């Protein structure tokens, strides 16, 4: 199946044939908590991981399984684990890697929730992080310690769409025996596949572009299957016999899919951030049109960026497609199809002007989500990043006049007219 092109894979992987029980062509919603074993030996084999398949609804579900297969194929990974939210996917990944007082080197311009997790929540459990200018490889390397467990980046930083050099960071991580973890929520596998550039683990908030319609929470961890968990001795949770799973070493039981298998069998088992079958179904509906939506998002974004860049009431547009953006060359390298539909601009003035602009929009919805088919807007400094101190906001490139846009798929003339109405209201 993987020989097919992206547009075909997004429709068929995981259900190449109709449902064998009902001949249904659409993926069924399997609303069940449990699964009947054929006999006692079959049950024991499932629990011992020697026979892959459903055990209990907290761990696996047949609708969820199709979603996992499909996203793994689209990202070029060996396996995936779908979870209840993007926050769960990121948390489980970092907890699995960082246990026993681990440390991360992280891009400093990342989603506010991920920043708070690394800067404030995980340190309560002995896991720490150093935030770096991800474009300065010397600074990144200098931040690596004996207990560092991974380098963590986003393909497109939230909210300013800054772009790391994934190839270079993967080489640096591997030089030190570390995995590179990449959040590809804003990139999507249609625009960029981080595993092809050396990433070892990819995470998503599937709530965003993968689902695409603002209806469903979900998260995904994709395992490249390429990282050697045994080589450094730093990852006993994955490589060593696990006392809470009758001595199973996941690298032996699951082979190259050891990382996501460990998270499913241990962290998901014990803490239960399970995706519902209905949520998995809705995300699958979104993925079926991913390429079509992303093309329209990219086209509309290009025209909005041009409009804002030439507007007299705009102080600055933070979009990597612009030649004067510091990551323009990286944008051309990693995003030949375009993209970066979530970005910020700075309106002339301050917080009052930003709020008046936002409150005057009609088509753009003021809400915390992004990557919806509907156009969205928010003021990061007083909402999504409001937990950050002023210095932290500055480090993230956020000012009081910063406005974040998420460009939808409406007609471009209506989008531009709505933005102009906002500017007119500020000037009035």
Residue ranges, per PLM feature:
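Well-ordered beta-strand positions enriched in small/hydrophobic/aromatic, beta-favoring residues
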Residues: 151, 219-221, 317, 343, ...
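Conserved PLP-enzyme active-site core in the AAT-like
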Residues: 14, 18, 80-310
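PLP-dependent enzyme catalytic core of the Aspartate aminotransferase-like
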Residues: 78, 119, 128, 146, ...
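Short hydrophobic/aromatic beta-strand micro-patches
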Residues: 222, 344-346, 406-408
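Conserved small-domain helix->loop->beta segment predominantly found in fold-type I
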Residues: 271-274, 278-280, 285, 289, ...
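Conserved N-terminal alpha-helix of the aminotransferase class I/II PLP-enzyme fold
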Residues: 39-91, 113-120
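Active-site beta-loop-alpha junctions enriched in small/polar residues
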Residues: 156, 185-187, 322, 348, ...
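N-terminal "arm"/small-domain region of PLP-dependent enzymes with the aminotransferase-like
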Residues: 1-61, 69-70, 403
């Amino acid at each position: 199946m993987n020989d097919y092109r992206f547009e075909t894979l997004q429709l068929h992987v995981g259900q190449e044939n109709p449902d064998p029980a009902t001949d249904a062509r659409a993926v069924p919603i399997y609303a069940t908590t449990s699964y009947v074993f054929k006999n006692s030996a079959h049950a024991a084999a499932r629990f011992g991981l020697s026979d892959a398949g459903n055990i209990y609804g907290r761990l696996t579900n047949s609708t969820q399984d199709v979603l996992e297969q499909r996203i793994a194929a689209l990202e070029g990974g060996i396996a995936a684990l779908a979870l209840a939210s993007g926050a769960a996917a990121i948390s489980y990944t970092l907890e699995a890697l960082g246990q026993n007082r681990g440390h991360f080197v992280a891009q400093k311009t990342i989603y506010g929730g991920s920043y708070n997790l690394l800067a404030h929540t995980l340190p309560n459990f002995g896991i720490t992080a150093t935030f770096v200018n991800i474009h300065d490889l010397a600074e990144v390397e200098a931040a690596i310690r004996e207990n560092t467990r991974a380098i963590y980046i986003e393909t497109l930083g939230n909210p300013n769409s800054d772009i790391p050099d994934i190839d270079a960071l993967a080489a640096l991580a591997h030089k030190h025996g570390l995995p590179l973890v990449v959040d590809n929520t804003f990139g999507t596998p249609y625009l960029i596949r981080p595993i092809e550039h050396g990433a070892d683990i990819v995470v998503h908030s599937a709530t965003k572009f993968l689902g695409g319609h603002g209806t469903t929470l979900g998260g995904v961890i994709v395992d490249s299957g390429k990282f050697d968990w045994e080589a450094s001795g730093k990852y006993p949770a994955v490589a060593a016999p696990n006392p809470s799973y009758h001595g199973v070493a996941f690298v032996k039981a699951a082979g190259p899919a050891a990382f996501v298998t460990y998270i499913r069998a241990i962290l998901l088992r014990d803490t239960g951030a399970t995706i519902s079958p209905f949520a998995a179904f809705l995300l699958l509906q979104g993925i079926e049109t991913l390429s079509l939506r992303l093309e329209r998002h990219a086209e509309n974004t290009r025209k909005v960026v041009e409009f804002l860049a030439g507007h007299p009431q705009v102080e600055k547009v933070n979009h990597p497609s612009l030649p004067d953006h510091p990551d323009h060359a990286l944008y051309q390298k990693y995003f030949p199809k375009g993209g970066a539909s979530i970005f910020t601009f700075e309106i002339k003035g301050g917080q009052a002007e930003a709020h008046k602009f936002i409150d005057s929009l009609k088509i753009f919805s003021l809400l915390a989500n992004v990557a919806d088919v509907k156009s969205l807007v928010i003021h990061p400094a007083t909402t999504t990043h409001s937990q950050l101190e002023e210095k932290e906001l500055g480090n993230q490139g956020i000012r009081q006049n910063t406005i974040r846009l998420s460009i939808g798929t409406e007609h471009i003339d209506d989008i531009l007219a709505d933005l102009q109405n906002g500017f007119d209201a500020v000037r009035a």
